[in-house]
């Protein structure tokens, strides 16, 4: 199982070249994209998620689906956006169920998967609380739970511990490590606390081209 960037290039316009002839093979485990804000980490995640299109080269997905296809978005990849991406008027539990529904996860799998994530992320007592009533750390954990509800082979996490204290960060680190052995997990971060998780590290503090 591999997610492959094959000689990809991307530019927002003729004056802003972000990637040029970049190649990398992502394998099961955790790849950390390290670097300062604006270095291209989030752009790469959006390319891998199919939200942006490469200007040249190709991305080969583990499922064989085109990176821009609806099936890939539904079942091939799960993306945790930078910032909280929860529906604010829905409960934590309903946010998780909606993620499962959108990913076409069999309904019989919803409850056990939801219960495990609520337990592992310390959200059991918050399951019926509206997302807009959560603290920052609680909302970040709920957003991760929503992402992991998808049984996708590729998980993309954009700054998952941004602004979190050590306690909340440790909870997220533990679950990501536990989940990553079976999936390709790519984390964009400038948080040094996450570097120890890396099976593979791409340093965006230096030019990303080859």
Residue ranges and their predicted role:
Residues 108-126:
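Conserved ABC ATPase "signature" region
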Residues 49:
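Helix-to-loop junction immediately C-terminal to a conserved catalytic motif
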Residues 90-102:
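Q-loop/switch helix immediately C-terminal to the Walker
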Residues 65-78, 107, 179:
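ABC ATPase NBD coupling module
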Residues 130-134, 138:
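Conserved ABC ATPase signature
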Residues 144:
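Hydrophobic anchor residue at the start of the ABC signature
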């Amino acid at each position: 199982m591999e997610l492959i960037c094959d000689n990809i290039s991307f530019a927002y316009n003729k004056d802003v070249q972000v990637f040029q002839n970049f190649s990398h093979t992502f394998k099961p485990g955790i790849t950390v994209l390290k670097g300062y804000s604006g270095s291209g980490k989030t752009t790469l995640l959006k390319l891998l998620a199919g939200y942006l299109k490469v200007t040249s080269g190709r991305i080969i997905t583990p499922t064989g689906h085109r990176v821009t296809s609806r099936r890939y978005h539904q079942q091939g990849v799960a993306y945790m956006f930078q910032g909280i991406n929860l529906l604010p008027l829905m409960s934590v539990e309903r946010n998780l169920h909606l993620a499962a529904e959108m990913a076409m996860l069999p309904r019989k799998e919803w409850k056990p998967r939801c219960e495990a994530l609520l337990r592992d992320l310390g959200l059991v007592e918050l399951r019926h609380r509206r997302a807009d009533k959560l603290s920052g750390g609680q909302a970040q954990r709920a957003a991760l739970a929503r992402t992991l509800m998808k049984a996708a082979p590729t998980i993309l996490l954009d700054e998952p511990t941004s602004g979190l204290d050590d306690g909340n960060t440790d909870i997220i680190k533990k679950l990501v490590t536990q989940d990553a052995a079976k999936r390709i997990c790519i984390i964009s971060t400038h948080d040094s606390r996450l570097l120890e998780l890396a099976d593979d590290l791409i340093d965006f503090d230096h030019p990303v081209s080859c």
